[in-house]
């Protein structure tokens, strides 16, 4: 079975890596929509129109489901995508529920792009789960874009993370929600400054579980046959699905995309696509 995974750049590879690690038998087509990046600076209407076009691309790829591995695209445009296709659509929402449950000091920070930080959906989730917790919603206009340009922008990324982390330390934050899929790519930089006492939450496991639930609901016979075949194969290499990397910008960023994929041996191709 083939699944489409998309983001504005490299961030969604945190989700792709989690899916491939947990369910390596799935074929994955990844779209980095670099030509339209950064999503965080676009209007709601622009993002809705773009996501509908992305949906058409994945329909032509004959995928069984689409994972919108981008918080900004999820909060701004996932409803428009769902209205345009019959494929199962899985989004990424800020993992605020587990954050409030884990926070011992009841002091939580949510770090997002401006579009996500200002979205009604994020505020709804916070109001639903925060109870008596202090919540600091923080945003960066440049961090996701700079992560896409890594390693040339490494020092700029480190400076931004240093500034954000110092603000969190000043507020005595003990739980951080990374509400942009780019940010877990540099999670170790947050950990170096915030230390072991700050729990850092990201959504990849939850999104992976939701994908499998939706595939099982939508394609019960296909999933049953696939899992039966996987369980009976003695050679685990036969269960290895493929990863195909696509970019709307061209081959300029392919080396960067490749560098963030954990199972590089599963990459079977790279393509420039027009959206």
Swiss-Prot record:
EC numbers listed for it are 5.1.1.3
State the source organism's domain of life: Bacteria
GO biological process: what's one of them?
Answer: cell wall organization
One of the entry's Gene Ontology molecular-function terms is:
glutamate racemase activity
Binding residues for substrate:
7-8, 39-40, 71-72, 181-182
Query: What residue stretch is flagged as signal peptide?
Result: none
NCBIfam families named among the record's database cross-references:
glut_race (TIGR00067)
List the PANTHER family: GLUTAMATE RACEMASE
Q: What is this protein called?
A: Glutamate racemase
Record the organism. Marinomonas sp. (strain MWYL1)
